[in-house]
């Protein structure tokens, strides 16, 4: 139950009206103006696979990933709507913003030793840190996500999980 309250707190913080550098035009503070809005790359952790991020505005983005969930032993797909409310550092060569937001996760748990496969769907609350290079079309990230999910296998019901990962994306 405490975990559910923590996820709700993350979701409430994500909907907060506070935004990073609202008055600064793109290119002066935050994301470089010449960088593309679509990034494609790899994520390592839980899951390990491919990821993409598309900026909808300078401080909001949609990020997705698909890959193998080694700890959970299955194929995972997730999507998050993230906000970049705080910039920790803004240097000549990089920007270091924090991001957070709500999302969804779908996972097909593999058979394991019993050989039975089952499907679960859930809500994610993600928080992460982005190392956004200003002089190259790259970023690197670390993120932690809490998940409340429903397992559709009879008898398993609701559950909770954590995902942690890091990765690199190239922007077009």
Features from the language model and the residues they span:
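Residues that define the transmembrane beta-barrel architecture of outer-membrane proteins
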Residues: 34-36, 46-48, 73-77, 96, ...
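Glycine-centered flexibility sites
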Residues: 39-41, 45, 49, 101-103, ...
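Predominantly the C-terminal beta-signal and adjacent terminal strand-loop region
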Residues: 74, 134-172
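Cleavable N-terminal export/targeting peptides
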Residues: 1-30
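Gram-negative (and chloroplast) outer-membrane scaffold detector with strong preference
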Residues: 54-140
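Short glycine/proline- and aromatic-enriched beta-strand/turn motifs that initiate or cap beta-hairpins
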Residues: 20-71, 76
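A general structural-boundary detector
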Residues: 7, 14-18, 39, 68, ...
């Amino acid at each position: 139950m405490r975990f559910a309250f923590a996820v709700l707190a993350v979701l409430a913080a994500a909907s907060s009206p506070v935004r990073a550098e609202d008055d600064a035009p793109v290119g002066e503070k935050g994301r470089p103006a010449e960088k593309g809005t679509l990034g494609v790359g790899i994520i390592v952790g839980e899951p390990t696979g491919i990821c993409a991020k598309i900026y909808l505005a300078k401080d909001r983005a949609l990020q997705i990933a698909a890959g193998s969930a080694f700890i959970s032993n299955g194929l995972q797909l997730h999507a998050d709507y993230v906000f970049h409310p705080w910039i920790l550092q803004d240097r000549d060569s990089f920007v270091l913003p924090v991001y957070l937001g709500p999302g969804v996760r779908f996972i097909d748990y593999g058979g394991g030793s019993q050989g039975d496969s089952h499907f679960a769907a859930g809500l994610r609350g993600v928080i992460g840190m982005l190392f956004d290079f200003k002089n190259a079309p790259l970023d690197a990230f670390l993120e932690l996500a809490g998940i409340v999910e429903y397992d559709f296998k009879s008898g398993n019901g609701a559950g909770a999980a954590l995902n942690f990962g890091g990765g690199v994306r190239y922007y077009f």
